[in-house]
Amino acid sequence: MVESKAQAAPVLNANPVLNTNARLPTLVIQPPKAAAGFDTRRMMYTRNPHQLEYFAKNEWVDTPAHMLQPLLVSAIAETGHFNAVLPKYSLVKSELSLESEIVRLIQIFTSKPSQVQFTLRASIIDNATGKVVAQREFSEKVASASDDPIGGVVAANLAVKKILKNLTTFSSQATLSWRASEVGAAIAKQPAIQALTQHN
């Protein structure tokens, strides 16, 4: 999942079932953003709640936000609840978008063993209207196997894995809600269409 140079390396139905006869939407994964201080390859840690520091000799192979996008694409695509799940640069027409932001990714040394906290904010957007279909913040803390950057990398991978699992459920729930509203809107238009046809 993620690597460092030090280690080359609304609440909805929890089990959504979609009508396979209906058209599935296409989802575009927008490039994840990162909160101030976290949009960097430098690995952050803290020894007290009021001070953030960076490891001097350890860093991610790329920014966490950049490494996260392909993981989001593959994890959500595996749900089977979308016609396609594509990165931002795709030219294919899409109905929905996923916007995300890394709020926090840090190794915490205020207790033993140290812990890695990963917090991600995600929103599903209706591309036609620009409205937010669903929004949620995910956060996981995972204990490090060792109190060093390598232990932090392993813990970060586990935290990312947990959040991806929860995010796939969230995206499926949001899609189910969106599709229900689309069907409802289509049904609401039918009487007016029928009346117009009869009048003509």
Functional labels for PLM-detected ranges:
Residues 1-65, 174-200:
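A structural "domain/chain start" motif
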Residues 1-12, 79-129, 145, 197-199:
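Surface-exposed short loop/turn segments
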